[in-house]
Amino acid sequence: MAQPYSARSRAIEPFHVMALLARANELQAEGHDVIHLEIGEPDFTTAEPIIRAGQAALTAGKTRYTAARGIPELREAISGFYQSRYGLNIDPRRILITPGGSGALLLASALLVDPGKHWLLADPGYPCNRHFLRLVEGAAQLVPVGPDVRYQLTPDLVERHWDHASVGALVASPANPTGTILTREELAGLSTAIKARHGHLVVDEIYHGLTYGTDAASVLEVDDSAFVLNSFSKYFGMTGWRLGWLVAPDAAVSELEKLAQNLYISAPSMAQYAALACFEPDTLLILEERRAEFGRRRDFLLPALRELGFNIAVEPEGAFYLYADISQFGGDAFAFCRHFLETEHVAFTPGLDFGRYQASHHVRFAYTQNLPRLQEAVERIARGLKSWQG
């Protein structure tokens, strides 16, 4: 009899939404019109200037490995982006290009977390964060958060939940699934609380750029020793290119470079050269138009769902999600999602994918469809509520 697969693998939970997505695909194959509000991927394709840059890179033979830290031109372009957007002078040496934001999270986890140690994470939160910690034999200390703290960690929560095994905290701003943002003052407070305990602060800034009304502050504005995870997937619309970056303190760069060399050698070369076009004025104009469109979608869907009775206690300031309490409708979140998929062919995500705290009566809607599709989705949801028996 073969040896069993690792306990590590068994401990990493699958996405509940994937079962719903598989069923949605079956329904589509049967000819049903499914409205997808479950997957966190922009519906826009990659902007044309980026595509052209990628095509030019392929034609020019830019298909070989690059340095593990990424091509110098891209690290310099990102450094310039921090200067223009945040007024920050970030040495390009501190920027490592990674295979998606996931690559940045993997590097930070491998560098900072020893076996048996943990980071504090908000619950609800992005599920892969805790799974990456398990992958490096660490753990996530999930901290229940609700609307009273806008679903974010606070210095008081850090003080209450920090223990002998804590080595840091990972926060997200804007956050998935709630869309809430940490202010500059809140980031500074978290930094102070974690430094007082000799820990590391890691901030997921993957949804920076996708904010509505107030720009998100970077933690690097208040803490130059923080680790920042970012990605070309969301604001820049390059999900399938698999490209991200990590900003780290200068003292950590050599260790991170060694890890990168061993874990993935380099990020995809053609994607790196394509990403140089992300920072061109014509591209940024397209991206800002898309941001405005996401804002219009949020401004439609938020009041529409509230009018139907969904309790969305905190208005999202960024990303493209609404996190809704469905307890007033009764029943379990997964069954609720399944009902609307089967009866109305609208797919959204059960809260179980984002943690444990009150997860069974929360769902997440992604406004990654155009306004006519969102309007149709709301009509279907209104109809489906009449037949729901929680």
Task: Describe the function of each predicted region.
Residues 9:
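Substrate/cofactor-recognition hotspot
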Residues 2-5, 15, 20-23, 27-34, ...:
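PLP-dependent class I/II
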Residues 60-64, 77-85:
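Glycine-rich loop-to-alpha-helix module at the N-terminal edge of alpha/beta enzyme cores
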Residues 64-65, 207:
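Intrinsically disordered, tyrosine-centered linear signaling motifs in cytosolic regions
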Residues 69-70:
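Short beta-strand to alpha-helix junction loop
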